[in-house]
Amino acid sequence: MSTVAPDLRGRIHREKRLMKPEEAGEFLRTQKIAHVGTVDPNGWPYVVPLVYIYEGGDLLFFHTGEHPGHFLTNLQNNARICVEVSEIGDLHRGRPYACNSALVYTSVIVFGPVKVLDGPESRPKKTWFLDRLLAKYGKSEWSFEPGYPLIDRIILYEQKMEVVTGKHSSGLSH
């Protein structure tokens, strides 16, 4: 007898903490690091922190180097990923017990398949990505020679954002 587990993607326990979709999108636009989760062929989870670009809509972009490793091998086996982006604030002291303390935080979880963009046909999209990456993470006073001569040495990933859930806590209650 086979039992199908319920799809729990996008569900949260405390509805009052649920962010509106536009709040989750704005949070994704402004944060710096995404933790990207994959599963290897033996069922082991693997999470890696990556810089990313999100400019609205339902696509999230990130990249790695060209060398095959754990991350790319996992994606070749299973293209479904989970991305987590968070910001942690202060711990608010609880009374009368320490376990009444609560953390200020915001987090967004994104589920969806990822597409690997590689090869000569991906150069325009890789150029777009690298331009956005430098604008987001670089400094305005930096200047470079035009072009990206090492562009073929990166792999670009495009995640289709199927399920997005954001939540936040003010730290004032559990």
Q: Across the structure, where does each feature detected by a protein language model lie?
A:
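Charged, gly/pro-rich active-site loop segments
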Residues: 1-16, 88-174
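Short, basic/aromatic recognition patches
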Residues: 7-35
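A generic structural signal for nonpolar/aromatic side chains embedded in well-ordered alpha-helices
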Residues: 28, 74-75, 133
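Short solvent-exposed loop/turn micro-motifs enriched in small/polar/acidic residues
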Residues: 29-31, 44-46, 101, 151-152
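Short beta-strand segments
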Residues: 31-66
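A generic structural signal for short beta-strands and their flanking turns/coil linkers
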Residues: 32, 48, 58, 77-84, ...
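A short mixed-secondary-structure module that forms the rim of ligand-binding clefts
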Residues: 53-91
